[in-house]
């Protein structure tokens, strides 16, 4: 079958897991699977987002894989450059360490760590201007969904960042991850039909914001597992996955990446 012109992304968000020794073992297991049955980069981009103190270690481990696997930062500072910002890591410091991908806007950071829209815009602006590719997360709560506000909330979250993203950055440096908050870490997931429906609305909204809207990868991030990956991958506006718990198991993560790669073959 002929695949979409958008190459899928499958990114493992490890969150505050695991210990560094276990992380190295996890990467080695994943590399072994790729060696046994490679997943071509022309069919699927793959990345992992480890804890900050393991970024360069994991990057070094991945450098010996038989294909490029991106190392993704889980967050970036709202402050640029260097300076007296205790505990912060700027986009410039990440790129200086050859980390060129970053998650911004994850619901856990919004809800637990106070990342409101102005902070997110600052993080996004600095990351984009430093040349990073940003996986920008949007999503609604269960209460918002039950009130029929899911589409409105998600589209507003995208419109909020539009002023700090240039036309060229939309085209080359933005990936959108839709993560229904009510499905994260709960084992619940939207049906493929529901996920496709809101992804289609996101696509429609992006096309109103930027001419690049039809070519921006849209990832689904609500409890993606090998058991539902094939159905999700078959949806025309789901161009990959932001994977949480399942990415902590090398075989599960590999199967999810394989499911999306097969849509391009």
From Swiss-Prot:
Entry keyword set: Cytoplasm, Gluconeogenesis, Glycolysis, Isomerase
GO molecular function: triose-phosphate isomerase activity
Residues spanning the signal sequence: none
Cellular component, GO, one term: cytosol
Pfam families: TIM
Catalyzed chemical reaction(s): D-glyceraldehyde 3-phosphate = dihydroxyacetone phosphate
Locations listed in the record: Cytoplasm
Active site: 106 (electrophile), 179 (proton acceptor)
Residues where substrate binds: 13-15, 185, 223, 244-245
Enzyme Commission code: 5.3.1.1
SUPFAM superfamilies reported for this sequence: Triosephosphate isomerase (TIM) (SSF51351)
Biological process per Gene Ontology, one example term: glycolytic process
Family: Belongs to the triosephosphate isomerase family.
Complexes and interactors: Homodimer.
Name this polypeptide is given: Triosephosphate isomerase
Organism: Acinetobacter baylyi (strain ATCC 33305 / BD413 / ADP1)
């Amino acid at each position: 079958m002929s695949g979409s012109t958008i190459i899928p992304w499958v990114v493992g968000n490890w969150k505050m897991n695991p210990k560094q020794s276990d992380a190295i073992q996890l990467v080695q297991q994943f590399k072994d699977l790729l060696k046994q049955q490679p997943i071509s980069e022309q069919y699927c981009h793959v990345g992992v987002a480890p804890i900050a103190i393991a970024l360069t270690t994991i990057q070094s481990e991945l450098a010996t894989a038989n294909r490029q696997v991106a190392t993704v930062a889980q967050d970036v500072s709202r402050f640029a450059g260097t300076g007296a910002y205790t505990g912060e890591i700027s986009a410039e410091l990440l790129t200086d360490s050859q980390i060129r991908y970053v998650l911004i806007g994850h619901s856990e950071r919004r809800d637990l760590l106070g990342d409101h829209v102005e902070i997110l815009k600052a993080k996004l602006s600095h990351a984009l201007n430093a040349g990073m590719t940003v996986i920008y997360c949007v999503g609604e709560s269960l209460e918002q969904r039950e009130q029929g506000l899911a589409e409105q909330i998600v589209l507003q979250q995208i419109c909020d960042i539009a002023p700090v993203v240039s036309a060229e950055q939309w085209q080359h440096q933005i990936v959108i991850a839709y993560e229904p908050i009510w499905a994260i870490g709960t084992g619940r997931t939207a049906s493929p039909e529901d996920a496709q429906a809101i992804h289609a609305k996101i696509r429609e909204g992006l096309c109103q914001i930027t001419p690049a809207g039809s070519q921006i990868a849209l990832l689904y991030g609500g409890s993606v597992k090998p058991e539902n990956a094939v159905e999700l991958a078959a949806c025309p506006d789901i161009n990959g996955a932001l994977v949480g718990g399942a990415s902590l198991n090398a075989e599960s993560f590999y199967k999810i990446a394989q499911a999306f790669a097969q849509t391009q073959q």
